[in-house]
Amino acid sequence: MIRNELIDQLARTQASALETQGLGLVPMVVEQSGRGERAYDIYSRLLKERVIFMVGEVNDQTANLVVAQLLFLESENPDKDISLYINSPGGSVSAGLAMYDTMQFVKPDVSTLCMGMAASMGAFLLAAGAKGKRYALPNSRIMIHQPLGGARGQASDIEIQAREILYLRERLNTILSEVTGQPVDKIARDTDRDNFMSGDQAKEYGLIDKVLARRGA
């Protein structure tokens, strides 16, 4: 009972966040059991199957939800894979790195799947899934580029912020090199501007392992 309540609470929070992002109302599903009927919002039901959605902009709110769900599912079963479904244009680097670090921190393998778009930090998180378990659907688009940023204020403050952006660019390039097998200098060249790829191109590049047309294919 407590487990179901925790799942419901986590998923309701995610469902509320998705609604605030303008993604519409969250549908409900009803399950029959020997104890009667039980209604779940769709994300609660999928969370029971160890499926997490990372949809929309990467920000602190979505990062906190994904991190919480990863930690919860690890506590439920540290040996069973977690699936992370991604449809995101990217967003905050710090929020993305929080999710990346947690994906590496938890014991279960985190399988990633791109549906629609995985751009910027969305593509970074897609590539950060467990090796051999990173997927994209046939018409998905994946885009990598260098981190974006702006600065204002005194010259010394602008210099500090510029150094931080350069550090983040180097760190992200290093991680992408590790997960794709591409040399760091090639990653740096390829992310200098927006670099869009199809699923097959992303597979060839090393961002994903397989393009899935059908489940179990």
Curated annotation (Swiss-Prot):
Any Gene Ontology CC annotation: cytoplasm
Gene coding for it: clpP
Subunit-structure text: Fourteen ClpP subunits assemble into 2 heptameric rings which stack back to back to give a disk-like structure with a central cavity, resembling the structure of eukaryotic proteasomes.
List of catalytic residues: S120, H145
GO annotation (BP), single: protein quality control for misfolded or incompletely synthesized proteins
Enzyme class: hydrolase
Localization (cell): Cytoplasm
Family, similarity comment: Belongs to the peptidase S14 family.
Catalysed reactions, as listed in the record: Hydrolysis of proteins to small peptides in the presence of ATP and magnesium. alpha-casein is the usual test substrate. In the absence of ATP, only oligopeptides shorter than five residues are hydrolyzed (such as succinyl-Leu-Tyr-|-NHMec, and Leu-Tyr-Leu-|-Tyr-Trp, in which cleavage of the -Tyr-|-Leu- and -Tyr-|-Trp bonds also occurs)
Phylogenetic lineage: Bacteria, Pseudomonadati, Pseudomonadota, Betaproteobacteria, Burkholderiales
Recorded GO MF terms: ATP-dependent peptidase activity; ATPase binding; serine-type endopeptidase activity
Name used for this protein in its record: ATP-dependent Clp protease proteolytic subunit
Disulfide bonds: none
EC number, UniProt record: 3.4.21.92
The UniProt record lists the keyword Protease: yes
Organism annotation: Ralstonia nicotianae (strain ATCC BAA-1114 / GMI1000)
SUPFAM superfamilies: ClpP/crotonase
Domain of life: Bacteria
